[in-house]
Amino acid sequence: MTKENLLQHLQECCDRLFGCSLEMATEKQVYRAVCVAVRELLEDDRRAFVEQTRAEQRKQVYYMSMEFLVGTSLRNNLYNMGLLEPAGEILHDLGFSLESLCALEPDAGLGNGGLGRLASCYMDAATGLNYPVTGFSIRYEFGIFRQKIVDGWQMEFPDNWLEMGDVWLHTRKDDAVEVRFGGQVHEWMDGDKFKTAQTGYQSVIAVPHDLYISGYGSKAVNKLTLWSASMPQSFDMNAFSRGDYVRALEQNTMAEAISKVLYPADNHINGKRLRLRQQYLLVSSSLQSILNEHLKNYHTLDNLADKVAVHINDTHPALCVPELMRLLVDEHDYSWERAWEITCATLSYTNHTVMAEALERWPVDLFREQLPRIYAICQEINRRLMEKLHCVYPNDPGKWEYMAAVTNSEVRMANLCLACCHKINGVSQLHTEILEKTIFRDYYNLDHSRFLNITNGIAYRRWLCQSNPALTGYLQSLIGDGFLNDANALEALLQYRDDPDVLENLQAIKRKNKVRLAAYIAKHNGVNVDPDSIFDVQVKRLHEYKRQLLNVLHILTLYNDIKDHPEKPVYPQTFIFAAKASAGYYLAKQIISLIVAVSNLVNSDPQVQNKLKVVFIEDYKVSLAEIIIPAADLSEQISVAGKEASGTSNMKLMINGAVTLGTLDGANVEIRERVDDENMFLFGMTADEVQALWQRGYDPRQFLTPELDRVLQMLTSGVLGQRFDDVAASLLTPRFGAADSYMTVADFASYKAAKAHAVEVYQDRTRFAKMSLTNIARAGIFSSDRSVEQYAREIWDL
């Protein structure tokens, strides 16, 4: 599209939306006009892409995920469509700035952490690769939450992202579907046919909203279909007429609650009930939509598995298994055997965790109350599974119990997927190995052919090309544009590893990004940080296994060392944290509070503040990550070995030239294979060593050094302005389960040594610049293009 055509389209949109010209419009009106114009261009390309795929009868992929961490869309779409430059020029001519317009756009409140960001990276990659993939999720009215730190404590506020973000959504009320909760199920035989009916249920209407996804240099356009919930009849006139005004609105309010917030706190029964309703709304409405579309094109479901692949992203959409069975058996009159054959061949499952508490299990009473027919189907799946297992593993009730889908008064979501899906994958080599050897071992031994590894990847055009334009431009000047289409072309950078001018220029670009982040920190945190200090970055959701606690305890040892030896030279370091803790996760919120308390202590101490700075940046999200990641020198990837499935922040930081400081966990293992030990800082036990220590009997007190003991006493003495008894207790006593469940104490000495080594190496600026260059050059394998091509070839059969 030419600049003139784009300007004309923008003028038409502004006139249609606001009845005025672009010259007369306010900045917000121009923002909306530009977004609508881009969306309409995507709609045109979408129609052409759909017509093409239908004509070719291409297999469709449907990616089910509870979250998609999309970030902002305006810059991403303009970049992918090749319109970034002409749009910027048009806006400049009108007296506006593309930067200021992009700043008006909120991050879409559709995700939280790595799971949702991975799903979004895969949608971007699939579109760029011309694969027809539709993502399904929920249109959360208030997202996860907006994080504010108030008196050192995380507070959660509604994230009203739709106020400015709704401009990207295309609502299709005519395609709404009904989802049923509760009631009773009646079963009978009609001749030789099994029949059921659900009565006394609550009906919820799911309305689809489409968000279009562009791909770099591609005319393909895919979409996220996001469901919102409401009642069929939103207003009870009879109740209102009786003066019962609250009841008149109550039912609709209860229905709408389903799509209000991502991951409502589930440390109480109402939260659990709401989460289950969310998951079923997502699955039922999506599968109904998929089958309706398929029947429109093929007039039969016999070929469903040949033309449709439904992918379950973690256990949240695991109800796809019984719901697809319900639709095939109850609604479309398939026999159980034929329906099971279709279901198994259609569904695939990615596991994202080895942590038992994250493998969802629902109490039978709650499950049966909300989803009576689905519960009956789960029981039948389990009955047939047990028949099979009794034959395969006779006289082994332990295996039957471990592999059951329904047992011990709970419905196990992961086992439903394992019992059914034709392909099951882990997301890093180590993670998949752990699945096959431990938690999924019995299913793996039953059928090796269903299991495979596909290591995660990132949409590097967003995380490098858009987030770090200075570095991207410099790389283009050195190695050409090939890496824009093929990330592996970054390896050509290695030829400059010993070029002093290139190393100096890379350092200068890094410093500019650090200056930009320092300005953000000064504005939002009121803390002045030195861009010539080491920017040591840990950005990811807050969880004990990710060990932000290990990082902050080490900072306190550095603080104590400076106080004890003020004359000792110390290279300045800035420690940067950003993370959200789940609303109901008390200990994680305590750790955030500890980080904030340590930052207050360190940053206010005149003896220390020119040597150490600690910053917690609130409300971590994609657009904030795009500022932090290009500025990082050190990438903290310090989970206890064997707990992180893969991680993707390690990849984003790597491709921007940060050097990994981490354990051999998740994708760190594969980063090491790419860059070797001399280009990262490794510490800690391996996954096998962690397991061996648990088996021997781990007592954290045996690993407690005097300096760490001193720090833990600081946590309970009040020297930080408050006491952190629960945090200290979690490391030394079994009050919260096993003492030090994630071996923070055991790995502390090794971590401290690795950090000291990293600081020493950083001061050799040439050596560190070579390490940084090597990481950039070797990061191409972690492109989501590679991951999605593997999914397409090895799972979806595209």
Give the label of every model feature segment:
Residues 1-798:
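A conserved ligand/cofactor-binding region detector
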